[in-house]
Amino acid sequence: MKKILYTVMALMCFVCCDKPSPTPGPEPGPSVQPEKTLAEAIIGEWHYTDASFGADIYLGLTENKKFELYQKIGDGAYHLYKGSWQIDEESAVLSGKYNDSQAWGSEYDVAISGDGKTLTLSPKASGAEENHTYTREEIPASVSENCVTVVKSEDYSPLF
């Protein structure tokens, strides 16, 4: 009986100690970019137009988590708001603060198209059911050079 026990134990040692064969590495060829995080995917310049509300908005999101929001409602000049943004990768929720440390009027659920050319922001504020769909578009110099810089205040709040 002891011989059987020793034999079984010896076999177990050999089986358990067997090293798995190495998996072959990737075949040579063009390198594949790793999938971008949501934060990386939304970095860039975006444009939103809402004809029913008369709003024209350009949004720039930078790698260092800063934003510039150029907003024009109706006629007149674009108003520039600046601040910082952050995104929760797990819940895909975008939030931010203006330069005066005031939080945005809402956090936003974020969705980006597979080709990275469309950004949809859905306000999480109570009662808000609209979606804001932005297209990837460079902010024109005519907008950035002729805007009115605003520090957010109670008197004039942006749509963002």
Task: Label each region the model flagged.
Residues 2-7:
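Sec-dependent signal peptide recognition
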Residues 8-11, 43:
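Residue-level detector of intrinsically disordered terminal segments
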Residues 18-82, 93-160:
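Lipid interaction determinants
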Residues 13-16:
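C-terminal motif of bacterial Sec signal peptides marking the signal peptidase cleavage site
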